[in-house]
Design a protein with these regions (language model features):
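Phosphate/NTP-binding elements of NTP-utilizing enzymes
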Residues: 1-340
Length: 340
């Protein structure tokens, strides 16, 4: 699968300057992005005079960057694997050297005009002429980030900054020679990558973007799973998905579910226990599908059952004005007779 993806990306010349690897977990997204970045570095190093080719000063340095939500994660994930990959390549060993550190070594291309670095904020890309970058969107809570919304805004700022630098610096004859790789597993419907892709597609500006979004059973080798499958009905914000019972897995019933607005998946039977045990997690991790509100502390299903036109708002004012030194409490603005 990934060989075909890489062929699709690079056989189109410089058509794609933004590449997004999303979908299920544990399918090789980061490793593929690293392989693509190594190839981008190889192409850049094969130019006789990269600075002259792109019309830059002789002293200009081009950058290969690795970004994550924190600098420690940026250094410890893709950046580390990238350097480990180059370490076993005879070609890269013949055309560059590695730093002397045994544990934290990094690659130094010959000529000293190409820099390989990592970062986590837009400021880490300032003043750099970024030729290629991997943005690996990790789990915010695992990274110790409490303000998720602020982290997403920071990530969008970083993404836009790097994308602008790639397109502005390495555009020639109407083509962008650099690439930005964004790697992210599905988590929730309001994730940074999920929202960004949707906005690009809705605005009709997605021609320059390549998106790989597949479930595990379409990416991993066929022999990994059983050939027998089962049906999963995928809902939306208003309809909760479920595993279709075996005694209802006939054509007419599946067609009726499609008519009701459900999407139908056919995972291998090996995955049935995971979907039955925790449907939302299996849908996210195995199928690479995020359901609106499914992973919140309060699910959309529990909210929907409480919606009614009979109840009235117990607060007469939408905004409560309570000063720091007031003796008023929120309860005093609550009119319980509205809901009784």
């Amino acid at each position: 699968y990934w060989k075909q993806v890489m062929n699709d990306i690079f056989s189109q010349g410089n058509r794609y300057d933004e590449v997004v690897f999303t979908g299920a977990t544990r399918i090789g997204k980061t490793s593929t992005a690293i392989t693509c970045t190594a190839y981008m570095l190889y192409r850049l190093m094969c130019l006789r005079d990269p600075q002259k080719f792109f019309g830059k000063k002789e002293v200009s340095k081009f950058s290969i960057l690795f970004f994550n939500v924190t600098k420690d994660l940026a250094k410890g994930v893709a950046f580390r694997e990238f350097n480990d990959t180059l370490k076993v390549s005879p070609w890269f060993n013949a055309h560059g050297i590695f730093s002397k550190s045994d544990r934290d070594f990094y690659y130094i291309p010959e000529g000293g005009q190409i820099v390989i670095d990592y970062g986590s904020s837009a400021s880490h890309a300032l003043g750099q002429q970024v030729f290629c970058c991997i943005m690996d969107e990790a789990n915010f809570s695992r990274a110790g980030i409490k303000d998720v919304q602020k982290a997403k805004e920071n990530l969008l700022d970083v993404y836009n900054t790097i994308s602008a630098r790639i397109k502005g610096t390495f555009r020639k004859n109407g083509e962008v020679y650099g690439k930005l790789f964004a790697v992210s597993s599905k988590k929730s419907d309001n994730d940074f990558i999920e929202g960004y892709i949707q906005r690009q597609m809705d605005s009709g500006a997605g021609d320059h973007m390549y998106v790989s979004d597949r479930p595990q059973w379409e990416v991993l080798p066929p022999e990994t799973f059983s050939s027998e499958t089962f049906y999963v009905a995928v809902g939306d914000r208003h309809k909760r998905g479920f595993v279709v019972p075996e005694n209802q897995s006939y054509f007419d019933n599946i067609q009726e579910l499609l008519n009701q607005g459900y999407s139908i998946l056919t995972p291998p039977i090996d995955m049935r226990p995971e979907f039955i045990a925790d449907f939302d997690i299996a849908l996210r991790d195995l199928a690479g599908i995020s359901i609106p509100g499914a992973l919140s502390f309060i699910t959309q299903e529990s909210i929907s059952t409480c919606i009614t036109k009979i109840r009235q708002n117990p607060f007469l004012n939408d905004i409560l004005q309570i000063g720091m030194k007031d003796t008023l409490s929120i309860e005093e603005f609550f009119h319980d007779q509205k809901i009784l």
